[in-house]
Amino acid sequence: SKAAVKHHAALPYSEMPEFMAALRNREGIAAKALEFTILTVARSGEVRGMTWGEVDLEAKLWTVPGDRMKASEEHVVPLSPAALSVLQAVHEAGLKPDDVVFPAPRGGSLSDMTLSAVLKRMGLKVTVHGMRSSYRDWAGDTTAFPRDVVEMALAHTVGSATERAYRRGRALDKRRKLMEAWAAYCDGKATSK
C-alpha cells in the first residue's frame, strides 16, 4: 500500500525561490552545503562526504564514486553556474584532493543533523531529503524533460545496467540543461512552459 512509503516533508516548489534567497543570506558552512545539496538534488550524505578530488571545476562535473552512492554506482553530476559559485565560495588555496568540500567547524565531515538544523532554524518543517521531491514535482509540472532524465539526476536506478550506461552517456547534456533550469528556477529566474 502507498501509505507504507515514508514521505519526507517537502517544500512546495513555488516557495523555493523565496527560500533559496533566504538561505543565501545565512552564514556558515552548513547553509552553503544545504544550498549545494538543493542545487544538485543530491542526497545529503553524498554532499557531506564530498571531497575536492571528486570535483572537476573545468569540466563542471562532480563525480561521486560508487562506494559513496546508495546504489553503489558512480554518479556524475553536472554543475550549474549556481552550484559552481557555492564551490568557489568555500574553496581555499592549498586544499588537497581528499579534503572535504564542506568541512565541519572542528574538522571532518558535517553530521547528518547539521543540514536539518539549518531548516529548523529557518522555521521550516521540511526535511533535507524532501527537497528532492520539490525538484521532482517542479520538473514534472513545469518542464518538458523526459522522466528518465529527471530521475537520473536523483541517481535513481532505472533500467538494466547496460541501458543505464548507454543513457548516462547520452543524457549528460540534457541533465546539464535540467540542472541549469532548476538552478535558474531556484534563483527566481523561472521561465515556466
Protein language model regions, located:
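Catalytic-site neighborhood detector that most strongly recognizes the C-terminal catalytic loop/helix
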Residues: 10, 63-72, 84, 144, ...
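Short glycine/proline-rich turn/loop motifs
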Residues: 1-3, 120, 162-163
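Residue-level signal for tight coil/turn positions that link beta-strands
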Residues: 57-59, 81
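Short, basic (Lys/Arg/His-rich) helix/loop patches that form interaction surfaces
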Residues: 17-31, 40, 77, 85, ...
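Basic, Lys/Arg- and aromatic-enriched nucleic-acid-binding interface segment
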Residues: 1-50, 58, 64, 69-73, ...
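Hydrophobic alpha-helical scaffolding
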Residues: 6-10, 37, 73, 77, ...
